[in-house]
Each structure stands twice: as C-alpha cells, then as structure tokens.
Amino acid sequence: MKVQGVLLIVICLLFCVTGCMDPDHAKQLASKGSLPAQDEDPSKMMGPGPAASSASAKAMAAPFDTSTRIQDVMNDPVFGGYGRLLFPVDEWYMSGSTLRDLQLTWYNDIDPEKTVEIVNTLWQRANAGETVFYDIYTEEEKTVDPEKADTGLFFFRGEPGAKFAVCNAGGGFAYVGAMQDSFPHALELSKQGYHAFALIYRPGAQTACEDLARAISFIFAHAEELNIDTDCYSLWGGSAGGRMAAWLGSYGPAAFGGDDLTAGCGHHAIYRPQRSYRKRSAHFRLCGRKRWHRKLA
C-alpha cells in the first residue's frame, strides 16, 4: 500500500509540473525544436497551399497575358537579344503598350488572344531549351551591314522529319508585320505537324528577297540538325510577303544570291496576285476573300 501511495504522489507531481510550465520556458523549448511555439501559424509550417502552387505553375507555363506590356515581352531574358524582333524594328509602325492594345500599320482585326498564344508558345519552348530563333547571317556579315542584325528565322517546330514552310509577313516592304501576318500561320502549320519558319527580313523588295533566299539556303544547310525534310517545301506570304513567296517560288534562291536550290513545291500568296510566271514556277495559290483570278484572267 505504501508503494502504491508513493507512485500516486509521483504521478500527481508530474501532472502539476507539465501542466503549469511557465509560458516563457515553453517558448524557449520551442525555439530549440522541442515544442511547437503556441503562437505559430500552422499554415506557415505547411508551405504554400494548392492554390498558390497552381498559380505559380500557371505563371511559369504561360507568363504573358493580354495585359502584359510589349516592352516586357521584348526584354524577357528567356528570349535573349531576339525578343525585340517579335515586333516591328521601327516602332512607329505599331501602337499600343500592351499585347491587348497592339496595332500594326495597314492591318486590322489583330486577335490579342492569338498574340498571347504565340509569345507564350515561343517562351515555353525557349524556356524548355529549344532553339526558337536562328540567325541567318554571321557576325562578320552583320558588322559589314548592320541592317542584317535585324533579320532571322523564328522556328515553330513540327514533327521530326516533316517538311517545312517559310512564312513571310507583309508590311509594304517598309516593315515586317510578323505578329499579324506570319507568326499565326507558322504556329498553325506547326500544329499540323509541319516545321514552319517565320522570316524577319530587311525592308525593301530586293533585300527582302535576298534575306528569303539566304533563309532557305540556311535551312537546307542545317536540315540534318533541324531534322527537316527538304524534298518539297512551301513558301507562304501576305501582301509584300506574298510577292516574296511568288518571286522565290518562280525564280529560286540562286536568283537572289542564295544557293542553287529547287524553288519549292508550292507558294501561297495571301492578298497579293502575281502576274509573272515561269515554266518551272512552283504551284501557286491565291488565298483570301477577294477573287483575284478575275484580275489575272
């Protein structure tokens, strides 16, 4: 009985000590990792919740939206030094400060959602390690002619080993309206499995055709690393770009300083008719709402 009484007293003393611990002492133990602090917010110990994690992942997957400033897209480090070529080099050919407000000279009906899809697609692929832009001129060539620094190919990758197309935007041979007139076409072609390039060229009919000839020659020279079938390619263009596609499709790259290559299997001109043809011209298709065949008849 004495032993049981002693045990009962010891147990009571233990309950008194632990239940009446000084709060300051409890905090000291908590700081040493022995106890959780009484005023600690449990949510802070659990890390970001599912909603926060989802929002962060979404921002990484699609960093741009219609409210994004155009300058922020141009200067995004993922794009390196070529982000500026997503938009007209001479900024007076465009207006608006955000992707929602973007307007290009001589164009209308620009779809902000498509603009966002284009820049997000390129950003995602570049961020994943893909090359989405290729220089077509060497640094030495750009030093001799600085305007060649404002050229290049944006690459919308298709299925491995697929055929390719080069899309050429219009702009009256004064600027390149790629965001409206070549990027959307290249993106949709890539969704169909084709490799598609959007050319950024120097203004002027002659220099534009020289840049297109150089671009085609570049693609042929790097076909193996690009995993591209060069057997039958197509040229696309709107307005001034349609003329480029027609001229290169008719006369071939060599006529404009490029390599001696085939003229391609087809060229597609949107908005502009072509009046000059050769026996070896590629298949030619006019696209658009107006019936250009009546003017060509």
Report residues per predicted region.
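Short beta-strand-to-loop junctions in surface cap/lid or active-site-entrance loops
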Residues: 151-162, 217, 226, 277
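Short beta-strand element of the alpha/beta-hydrolase
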Residues: 162-171
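Short beta-strand/loop motif that positions the catalytic acidic residue
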Residues: 285-287
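N-terminal cap/lid segment of alpha/beta-hydrolase-fold proteins
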Residues: 81-82, 86-160, 209, 251
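C-terminal motif of bacterial Sec signal peptides marking the signal peptidase cleavage site
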Residues: 16-19
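Conserved alpha/beta-hydrolase "acid-adjacent" motif
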Residues: 292-297
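Short amphipathic alpha-helix adjacent to the substrate-entry channel of hydrolases
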Residues: 179-197
